[in-house]
Amino acid sequence: MPNHLKRPIHCTFATAMKQFNVPIIYRSPLIAAVKNKRRQEDKMKKDFSPTLLDFGPLQLYLARHFGFCYGVENAIEIAFRTIDENPGKRIFLLSEMIHNPQVNADLQDRGVQFLQDTYGKQLIPFESLSKNDVVIIPAFGTTLAIEEKLRAIGIPIQRYDTTCPFVEKVWNRSEQIAKKNYTVIVHGKPTHEETRATFSRAAKAAPAVIVNDMAEAVVLGEYITGENKVDDFYSRFAGKYSNGFEVEKDLQQVGVVNQTTMLASDTQDIADFFKQVMIKKYGLDESTVDKHFADTRDTLCYATNDNQSAVYGLLETEADFAIVVGGYNSSNTSHLVELCEERLPTYFINDEDKIISPDEILHYDLHQKLEKQTKGFLPLKQPVKILITSGASCPDALVEGVINKLAGYFNAAIKTGAFIKKFS
């Protein structure tokens, strides 16, 4: 069995059930009814089994957790409120608010301009800004260098900062272990906005280095054990380590934090790996390993963990294929796709329009980085069983759109209203 499917991470997270003022176009009466019923029946979030929408010839299984998380709803509320509160002003986003094309397009339609693209390429120069402009910091956060540029212009960044509180929790934990002289290892994609922001803060407080995956973690571990030559480190990890990084000195004590949208199980595996490296190198045991390894498992994002655990539960159901809905550049959504792909055919789409007909679907291939067309995706049998989930930046309305599109092919869309009553 593939490693991802062996061991979901089961943690308990306490979260406030705040109600956010999110545009109604992103809401779904059906999905809201399903989620509310499941929430009432499973207040401790112990049950990760899916919800069945039985249309007769079509059976749709919805993941226990999916869609907008706390951080995303918080960011959307602040962004749209900022627009309403600043009529006539120029409003900018540092980059995409979240990795969802519909939400970003809606903000642009309201006049918001992006200063950078997802990868940090400048679209509008900072020099063109004035202190009278409004700049919104996205949910991923931003680097200290960019914050300083905005302050120098006179722009009040705290007022329009939508950084996810769970991302800030990672930053705070990095600072805490840095004060105890641990080097911060960031598990994340080096070009992702959140990883750049986290690395920026970690590197200010302590030596820091980024690892993209377990393969890179193993290589870094070999520098700790002395199996790799120190001089090779600087080319192997070019652009991924802090200024003045000294391999032999700075890898004696380490702690691992992550880009919150990475697979929780992958981050835990990487942390466990470095823990074992330290135990072996310094002759430690569980009671003494904290001299060289900081336990940071409390920084794992609850929403990422819930959505991923829900996919493990979803995959316990035998089905014909899975559909994952979300932005193609969304890291957390991509990981859900990867989990599903290991078990059954999976179609990654960003809205219902990608389902062209009962015989044809346009979907994104993560590996080839392009959209592909697949014919005959609906099997000629009944009932057709489909697993459905979505990323943390995907509006529930898009998922309902997919449900209605599929149900329409089986003359079953009329049952959607009945499901709302059933789950209400």
Which residue ranges define each predicted feature?
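The feature marks the mature, well-folded catalytic cores of soluble enzymes
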Residues: 5-424
